[in-house]
Design a protein with these regions (language model features):
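Signature of N-terminal electron-transfer/Fe-S-associated modules in redox systems
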Residues: 1-204
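Short, intrinsically disordered, charge-balanced linker/junction segments flanking boundaries
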Residues: 207-210
Length: 210
């Protein structure tokens, strides 16, 4: 099980992205930075609010760190729990990785999509090719290796029980967080996530330029 509790410390900028935190602060370098603008999917990781909800694939390069405080984050570094996840094994078997830079993002997107509780419904090995195309629509392979990646997706779907079991991720906490007040960090830039309308109004009044 891949689970760790991290505190967002004073060295973490208030405007840091999830990707910056994962690679620099947490040392989890499996998640890659490709475009830094949310277009290529190389930085895809999975986020969920609690263990009773399905993971959602997000682009870590454009996700503010403050937005995922208290959420579980699963990266490619912990996907296999000591071995290869079925999606990773299938990518190897079907030669779905060429230069390899985009591979972690594709793996994470497919792992999330194989979840039977996914909001868009379950995909299986008999799902049509277009459904699988949509599953990786947010990921770009510059080597144009889409056919073997799609083959790997369908192969992974055959390992139903294993492919649909995702481990727990790391939980990101914050220094300034309580049940009564929203999350707030300060530096040259700031981040504030109010938990009530009153908090929002107070923050807006204090920073009308925001």
């Amino acid at each position: 099980m891949f689970r760790a509790l991290f505190k967002v410390n004073a060295s973490t900028r208030a405007d840091a992205t999830l990707l910056e935190y994962l690679r620099v602060d947490a040392g989890l370098t499996g998640t890659k930075e490709g475009c830094a603008s949310g277009d290529c999917g190389a930085c895809t990781c999975l986020v969920r609010s609690d263990e009773n909800t399905p993971y959602q694939a997000v682009n870590a390069c454009i996700t503010p760190l403050g937005d995922v405080v208290g959420h579980e984050i699963l990266t490619v570094d912990g996907l296999g729990e000591g071995g290869l996840h079925p999606v990773q094994s299938a990518m190897v078997s079907e030669h779905g990785s060429q230069c390899g830079f985009c591979t972690p993002g594709f793996v994470m997107a497919l792992a999330a999509r194989l979840d039977p509780n996914h909001p868009q419904g379950e995909l299986t090995e008999v799902s049509d090719r277009e459904a699988w195309n949509q599953a990786i629509a947010g990921n770009l392979c510059r080597c144009t290796g889409y056919r073997p990646i799609l083959d790997a997706a369908q192969l992974a779907a055959k390992s139903a029980a294993r492919a649909r079991t995702l481990p727990q991720g790391l939980v990101i906490d914050a220094m300034h967080c309580s049940t009564e007040e929203g999350v707030k960090t300060e530096s040259l830039a700031g981040f504030f996530r109010p938990r009530s309308l009153a908090e929002f109004r107070a923050a807006r009044a204090a920073h009308p330029e925001a």
